[in-house]
A protein has these predicted regions:
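Short aromatic/basic micro-patch
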Residues: 1, 37-39, 71, 93, ...
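NAD(P)-dependent short-chain dehydrogenase/reductase
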Residues: 1-37, 43-44, 50-51
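Substrate-binding strand-loop-helix patch
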Residues: 10-11, 35-46, 66-83, 133
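Amphipathic alpha-helical segments that line or abut small-molecule/effector binding pockets
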Residues: 43-54, 128, 132
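Mid/C-terminal beta-alpha module of Rossmann-like enzyme folds, strongest
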Residues: 55-100, 107, 143
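A hydrophobic C-terminal alpha-helical subdomain
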Residues: 98-119, 124
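Amphipathic terminal alpha-helices
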Residues: 127-143
Length: 143
């Protein structure tokens, strides 16, 4: 089992694509600053799985964590998305209670990746580097 967090890619609906769309449509966005975690680029998760699969042995059972390296709030993530996308949109930090959600979200959801790195020799890049690749791909394909 591989657990992940804050998953995004060039495809489907996700936070990166939503922030880019809203950043183009609005002059100001309010984004939660008191929930911290680590974004995970789906391409990096897929590459990690491909790296791990040949190393799986019969009877191996464990839970691993995978996300990109580094830590940020949703606000930090949104700012990076808007900046890397070259958009001029004001982003204001708000507290979780100011943005009602159907699901309760933990204030700290950073995953410890030491086990997956040790057991499978995985190197993981920083979330900002992965985000740059995703945004470059989105812009290259006019998404």
């Amino acid at each position: 089992i591989i657990r992940t967090s804050w998953l995004y890619s060039e495809y489907g609906s996700n936070f990166v694509k939503t922030m880019r769309r809203l950043g183009k449509e609005r002059g100001m966005l309010k984004v939660i600053f008191d929930q911290v975690g680590t974004p995970t680029y789906a391409g990096d998760l897929a590459a990690a799985i491909v790296h791990i699969l040949p190393q799986i042995r019969p009877g191996m059972k464990s839970i691993y964590h995978f996300s990109n390296e580094g830590v940020c709030s949703w606000y930090d993530f949104a700012r990076a998305i808007i900046e890397m996308s070259g958009l001029s949109c004001d982003i204001r930090p708000i507290e979780s209670w100011e943005y009602p959600s159907k699901a309760a979200r933990p204030p700290y959801s950073v995953l410890n990746k030491a086990k997956i790195k040790k057991d499978f020799g995985i190197r993981i890049r920083h979330w900002r580097d992965a985000l740059r690749e995703c945004i470059d791909n989105l812009e290259e394909n006019n998404l």
